[in-house]
Amino acid sequence: MIRGGDIAKGTVLLHKGAPYLVVEREFVNPGKGAAFARVKMKHLRDGSVLTQTVKTSDTVEDAVVDSHRAQYQYDDGECFVFMDTRSFEQIFVSKGNVPGRERYLREGDEYDILIWNGESIDIKIPTKMVFRVAHSEPYLKGDTVSGATKPVTTETGLVVRVPLFIKQGEKILINTETNEYQERVND
């Protein structure tokens, strides 16, 4: 059990028997009445988001979630297959549990897999990742009518808007939380 005042971003809680990841917490101390925390949580199975209000004096149940470092191997159609880097056992993560994550997975890269009640429920994607640009339209001088960015496709199929000077084959740093270009990366 965890007190409402101790809930922090990144904590995994049980709500109605399901695991939720706290993505945002705002502490509110009204002039009158008890202090409370407004907690925004993401369901770790289906990705739905809900906001809950918890009094700081109340207790909530925290979920026991294990994290395993694993190397991404391949996509078998229904699951993403990883190999635990310590035990070398295969870990299967259902695509239904992690919609949209395939664009951030590269064979051989390591990720943290969250396991709850023996089930792989989430893949922790690093906040910033480097990708190689697989496809980019050429930049034509003076072609700034449409703005100073253009869409490019990375090696994993992720489409990101980047400045016009980015060329095919270059490496770029992407913020995976906002899906935005950060900077060009030199080899």
UniProtKB/Swiss-Prot annotation:
CDD domains membership: S1_EF-P_repeat_1 (cd04470), S1_EF-P_repeat_2 (cd05794)
Subcellular location: Cytoplasm
GO terms for MF: translation elongation factor activity
InterPro entries found in the cross-reference section: Elong-fact-P_C (IPR015365), NA-bd_OB-fold (IPR012340), Rib_uL2_dom2 (IPR014722), Transl_elong_fac_P/YeiP (IPR020599), Transl_elong_KOW-like (IPR013185), Transl_elong_P/YeiP_cen (IPR001059), Transl_elong_P/YeiP_CS (IPR013852), Transl_elongation_fac_P (IPR011768)
SMART domains in UniProt: EFP, Elong-fact-P_C
A single GO cellular-component term on record: cytoplasm
Keywords annotated in UniProt: Cytoplasm, Elongation factor, Protein biosynthesis
Transmembrane stretches, start-end: none
Keyword Cell cycle: no
Pathway the protein contributes to: Protein biosynthesis; polypeptide chain elongation
GO biological process: peptide biosynthetic process
Function summary: Involved in peptide bond synthesis. Stimulates efficient translation and peptide-bond synthesis on native or reconstituted 70S ribosomes in vitro. Probably functions indirectly by altering the affinity of the ribosome for aminoacyl-tRNA, thus increasing their reactivity as acceptors for peptidyl transferase.
Family (UniProt): Belongs to the elongation factor P family.
HAMAP family registered for this protein in UniProt: EF_P
Protein name per UniProt: Elongation factor P
Taxonomic lineage from the root: Bacteria, Pseudomonadati, Spirochaetota, Spirochaetia, Spirochaetales
Gene that specifies this protein: efp
